[in-house]
Amino acid sequence: MNETDFSDVLKAGVTRFQQHIFPKRRLLFEKLAKAQKPEALFLTCADSRVIPSLITHTGPGQLFVERNPGNLVPIYRKEAVGVSASIEYAVTALRVEHIVICGHSDCGVIKGILHPDSVTKLPAVARWTEFGMPARDALFAEYPHLPEAEQLPILTEFNVLNQIDNLYTHPSVQQALQEERLTIHGWVYHIESGEVREYNADFNRFVSLSGD
């Protein structure tokens, strides 16, 4: 399929939305046109296979979504950073009650963090992966002899936990936690099975959200 063909697909999708979906949910969109009141900030990867509303079965207005390669959260600094602005706006202005940091299987950025030489020809990506290097360091410190085949899934989990640590450096998050109005969740979505695993602090590991 060439670029022109896919442009036609996108346009046809808009037409179907306007003719078949929007009319059935007109009242919802009229309400949303006046204001938004999302219940969660969903911070995940920009990967095209990860669709937050599909995974969580949520509708328009329920999730405030921040996406970037590798679902990374830079440590807070006063200089303007897109991720930081999204966090601050969601927590302080919209007063979301939950933040979900959601990694996923087969993540290209996590592969780049694991193998930095693989992204040397992508200088912007290489610089971006630096925000995930503490997770890589933690992986090799805890599992120095881990077989290569097992490194990627564990690093994916370590990265989620590392980004939660970075989240705690943001003043808006600190304030909301102090006020006991915010809960933070760490998830990993497995594309091949549809399973979502959440970090459980009591067990110190990721467990299935479905309870299996």
Regions found by a protein language model. Name each.
Residues 43-45, 67, 100-104, 185-190:
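Short beta-strand segments
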Residues 48-69:
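Catalytic core of membrane glycerolipid acyltransferases/transacylases, capturing the structured
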Residues 1-38, 71-97, 108-212:
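Divalent-metal-activated hydrolytic enzyme cores
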Residues 36-53:
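Conserved H-X4-D acyltransferase segment
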Residues 47-49, 104-109:
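Gly/Ser/Thr-rich loops at beta-strand to alpha-helix junctions
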